[in-house]
Design a protein with these regions (language model features):
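Extracellular beta-sheet-rich ligand-binding/adhesion modules
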Residues: 1-220
Length: 220
């Protein structure tokens, strides 16, 4: 497996042969300019590192077998990023990345090292989406597909964690946060029957009793 490193100041377009056996590492290290994926091609690569500059994702599916790191600009192009590795994959970098669709297809989990947002859909095919102490932003129209007691958003279980923040439009809404800790799945459902203005709800499960607990057995 080799690496393709994009430098310079102009715009560049790169096409990956879908029949290629080896998946490369893509590194974007540009002072100015954008690296664009072929819009009609589904990519399968080992890793994507945006150290500097911009990367335009394919409008189809970007399959990643290793890590994603963004310290520049990632333009999702309404495409899907599928994490399909066999060891834990990370989403890191210094930029807060906005994804359109994410397919969590890694039994060893996907782990957040930086805050990120999902605009359209988070699909659980395999494994958990581990946010650690980071924040996951979900947009007004974001949906979550195929979550379960073994496939869910996992927080660090501490009150210092930032949790999951979901935006809601004015009006009614019904949404389930498929969230929990490493030890327990504790989904939360909100049925909003009246909402006069747009807003957001933040959920962070905590392992342990609430400090105001008055029942000795912590059964409430």
């Amino acid at each position: 497996t080799g690496s393709f490193i994009f430098t310079g100041t102009g715009n560049q377009t790169y096409t990956i042969d879908p029949a290629a056996i080896r998946s490369p590492n893509i590194v974007v290290r540009k002072g100015t300019g954008t690296v664009s994926a072929s819009a009609t091609t589904n990519w399968s690569i080992r890793s994507l590192t945006i150290s500097q500059g911009s990367f335009d994702a394919p409008t189809g599916t970007l399959n990643l077998n290793f890590n994603f790191s963004n310290s520049g600009v990632f333009n999702h192009n309404n495409g899907n990023v599928t994490f399909a590795g066999t060891t834990t994959q990370t989403i890191g970098g210094t930029s807060v990345t906005s994804f359109f669709d994410i397919n969590n297809n890694n039994a060893a989990n996907v782990s957040l090292l930086q805050n990120c947002s999902i605009v359209n859909d988070l699909t659980f095919t395999n494994g958990r989406f581990v946010i650690n102490a980071r924040r996951l932003f979900l947009g007004v129209n974001t949906t979550i597909t195929a979550s379960s007691s073994t496939r869910y958003i996992q927080s660090n279980g501490l009150s210092s964690g930032l949790g999951v923040e979901k935006s809601f439009a004015a009006g009614t809404a019904n949404f389930t946060f498929p969230i929990g800790t490493a030890a327990r799945y504790t989904p939360v459902n909100y049925n909003i029957t009246a909402n006069g203005a747009p807003g957001s709800i933040n959920i962070q499960p905590v392992t342990g009793a609430h400090p105001s607990t008055t029942v000795a057995a912590n059964t409430q």
